[in-house]
């Protein structure tokens, strides 16, 4: 009896699974979107179980080689399309309606809520408009002072290793420096991560990012309903660390809101006005200050609204900057002629004193360093994947993408395609000075900060932060090619499982 019942349930499940998928399967076949062999119910889940951050880049490169520029995977009931075809990039990224992140990222909502990264529709539009003043050039000028000061702290920390013989993994140093910058520019508080890496907020954030990164690569941990069952200890640790972060941020918000209310009460309050020449002036406006003064539909943002945006800013800014700077310094250490050109430009623009402060204007004059950063982000893009959710059938040329599908745009593989970049595996900053090369490259073949309506709102901030830190390090140290080479690893960002290793040798001061 029970055996027959079990067989009946199994048959019904298989029929249900097949009927649920059949329309999309037929559509994929007509559009010649192929992929690995699937089995009922779990789809490609067994292949996904063997996927690790360390083998992700190689595995998906193999899939592209086998199935062409676009292929599909089924993970349990979720359909995923992966593509490096620019016609998909254009249709998806230019759309004003396809703004929802791929379902792959929905587990981040417990951490980031409805912040700019995950929100859509009117909420996303309103929030983005509210955040715009934080990236006004006047605010950025004040932020550069914070970037410069914290890069100086990192340079001091590196002195203990600057003997020309010791191999240093720069990733951990850059990560703490980037966190100091993002927290101070976001909230106006100094967590002093570089001097106090065990500060509760710092430890909690690093733990949350680590766990969430592991979840992205783990089928058993990715789904919210399965996570507490598959890894209960990790689940409880994540909840505890998120609470530590939120309690800290909430406390800062309450304190800053109280200061704002007192200013309104005693008549010293000065409202934020876009276009005001003094925006970000003496008060040195932070992201938090701007959010506290903002309104949506004539209503102030709640503490939860503000915390979500602060958390997104810190989460996105810390990791992406760390990836970009670490890979740039590693590449510079392996290319002495490039390093020499950078140093000559730094002395020419910033002067011979390695401790001289930088300004936004001076950083913008570093054109060769711009090319080095661009080339780094081409070969080692901090964000190698862009995901969107397709709710309804979408026609792209002759191809139909069925609704209820997540599409993952894979710029990492575009950047290494000789169709768009000659000698794609060669680190060659000069390619960005060649007008012929840049003019012949399709616009969407290089999108380190994404493109379209949902591009990165903080890209100017990120470029300044990278230039401030790289310029400070190169003015103080010659970078040497010590340690293991890179081994690409993907979580939320691109990193290296072998570290970003260099040697350091103090520079002789130029007189």
Curated annotation (Swiss-Prot):
Q: Which family does it belong to?
A: Belongs to the cytochrome P450 family.
- Gene expressing this chain: Cyp4d21
List keywords of the entry alphabetically.
Answer: Endoplasmic reticulum, Heme, Iron, Membrane, Metal-binding, Microsome, Monooxygenase, Oxidoreductase
Q: What does this protein do?
A: May be involved in the metabolism of insect hormones and in the breakdown of synthetic insecticides.
GO molecular function, a single term? iron ion binding
What is the recorded name of this protein?
Answer: Probable cytochrome P450 4d21
Q: Does the keyword Oxidoreductase apply?
A: yes
Where does this protein reside within or beyond the cell?
Endoplasmic reticulum membrane; Microsome membrane
Q: GO:BP terms for this protein? A: mating
Organism of this sequence: Drosophila melanogaster (Fruit fly)
Q: Its topology with respect to the membrane?
A: Peripheral membrane protein
A Pfam family for this UniProt protein? p450
Cofactor(s) needed by this chain: heme
Recorded GO cellular component terms are: cytoplasm; endoplasmic reticulum membrane
Amino-acid positions noted as binding heme in the UniProt annotation, renumbered to this chain: 456
In terms of one coarse class, where is the protein primarily found?
A: endoplasmic reticulum
Is Manganese among the key words of this record? Answer: no
According to the UniProt entry, what is the EC number of this protein? Answer: 1.14.-.-
Q: Which domain of life is it from?
A: Eukaryota
């Amino acid at each position: 009896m029970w055996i027959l019942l079990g067989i009946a349930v199994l048959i019904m499940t298989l029929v249900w699974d097949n009927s649920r998928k059949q329309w999309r399967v037929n559509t994929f076949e007509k559009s010649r979107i192929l992929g690995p062999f699937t089995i009922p119910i779990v789809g490609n889940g067994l292949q996904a179980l063997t996927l690790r951050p360390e083998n992700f880049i190689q595995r998906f490169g193999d899939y592209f080689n086998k199935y062409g520029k676009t292929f599909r995977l089924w993970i349990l009931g979720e359909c995923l399309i992966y593509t490096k075809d620019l016609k998909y990039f254009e249709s998806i990224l230019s759309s004003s309606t396809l703004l929802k992140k791929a379902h792959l990222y929905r587990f981040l909502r417990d951490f980031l809520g409805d912040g700019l990264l995950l929100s859509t529709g009117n909420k996303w539009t309103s929030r983005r408009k509210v955040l715009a003043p934080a990236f006004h050039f006047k605010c950025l000028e004040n932020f550069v002072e914070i970037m410069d000061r914290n890069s100086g702290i990192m340079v001091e920390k590196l002195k203990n290793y600057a003997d020309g013989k010791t191999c240093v993994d720069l990733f951990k140093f850059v990560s703490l420096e980037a966190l100091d910058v993002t927290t101070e520019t976001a909230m106006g508080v100094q967590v002093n991560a570089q001097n106090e890496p065990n500060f509760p907020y710092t430890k909690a954030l690093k733990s949350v990012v680590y766990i969430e990164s592991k979840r992205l690569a783990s089928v058993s941990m990715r789904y919210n309903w399965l996570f507490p069952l598959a890894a209960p200890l990790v689940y409880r640790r994540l909840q505890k660390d998120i609470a530590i972060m939120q309690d800290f941020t909430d406390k800062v918000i309450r304190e800053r809101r109280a200061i704002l209310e007192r200013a309104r009460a005693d008549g010293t309050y000065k409202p934020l006005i876009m276009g005001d020449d003094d925006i970000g002036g003496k008060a040195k406006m932070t992201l938090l200050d701007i959010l506290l003064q903002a309104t949506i539909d004539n209503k102030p943002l709640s503490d939860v609204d503000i915390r979500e945006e602060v958390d997104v800013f810190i989460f996105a800014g810390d990791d992406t900057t760390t990836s970009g700077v670490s890979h740039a310094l590693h590449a510079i250490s392996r290319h002495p002629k490039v390093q020499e050109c950078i140093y000559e430009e730094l002395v020419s623009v910033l002067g011979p004193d390695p401790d001289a402060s930088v300004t936004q204007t001076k950083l913008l004059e570093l054109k060769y360093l711009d090319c080095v950063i661009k080339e780094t982000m081409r070969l080692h893009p901090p964000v190698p994947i862009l995901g969107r959710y397709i709710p309804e059938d979408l026609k792209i040329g002759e191809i139909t993408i069925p609704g209820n599908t997540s599409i993952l745009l894979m710029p990492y593989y575009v950047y290494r395609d000789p169709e768009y970049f000659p000698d794609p595996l060669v680190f060659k900053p000069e390619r960005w000075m060649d007008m012929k090369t840049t003019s012949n490259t399709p616009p969407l073949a290089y999108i380190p900060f994404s493109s379209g309506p949902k591009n990165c709102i903080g890209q100017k901030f990120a470029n300044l932060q990278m230039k401030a830190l790289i310029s400070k390090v190169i003015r103080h140290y010659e970078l040497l090619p010590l340690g293991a080479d890179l081994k690409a690893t993907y979580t939320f960002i691109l990193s290296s499982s072998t570290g970003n290793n260099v040697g350091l040798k103090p520079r002789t001061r130029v007189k």
